């Protein structure tokens, strides 16, 4: 996992060049938006159980076969595993949002996840639907202007959305 600064240095070094003005400008913009990033990560982290619970509730309302006898989330043990997995994905999305880099999400969470779900017989489309529901809930919290640093959060919200999109695509 590399933070944005380390990644820029590594890329410049690989090219055998100095860090470009455009790279410096991009990093400066990232630093100036750091408070918004911290606010967003804090909000998602502080509301993680609500995000997971509301996404799960909506997922099971949309796909009741999951919680019916024989469903992948039937029995409290399987339900707990489902909620745990949703929480883990959300946690790694916050790590990526915090660092501004998806590699931690890709390397430590998503790598091999589809294969694991296939081996367990868990429908990837249902997992992807759950991730998308978490995305909706998390972005709703992030985009709530009350008590957040002044400024436009559209690009940050879009970035966070891409982390959820990566997670959903990796299991679908």
Curated annotation (Swiss-Prot):
Keywords: Antenna complex, Bile pigment, Chromophore, Electron transport, Membrane, Methylation, Photosynthesis, Phycobilisome, Thylakoid, Transport. It is a peripheral membrane protein. The modification N4-methylasparagine is found at residue 72. One of its GO terms (cellular component) is plasma membrane-derived thylakoid membrane. (2R,3E)-phycocyanobilin binds at residue 82. InterPro entries: Globin-like_sf (IPR009050), Phycobilisome_asu/bsu (IPR012128), Phycobilisome_asu/bsu_sf (IPR038719), Phycocyanin_b (IPR006247). One of its GO terms (biological process) is photosynthesis. The keyword Oxidoreductase does not apply. Contains two covalently linked bilin chromophores. (2R,3E)-phycoerythrobilin binds at residue 153. It is found in: Cellular thylakoid membrane. SUPFAM superfamilies: Globin-like. It comes from the Bacteria. Belongs to the phycobiliprotein family. PANTHER family: C-PHYCOCYANIN BETA SUBUNIT (PTHR34011:SF7), PHYCOBILISOME 32.1 KDA LINKER POLYPEPTIDE, PHYCOCYANIN-ASSOCIATED, ROD 2-RELATED (PTHR34011). This is R-phycocyanin-2 beta chain.
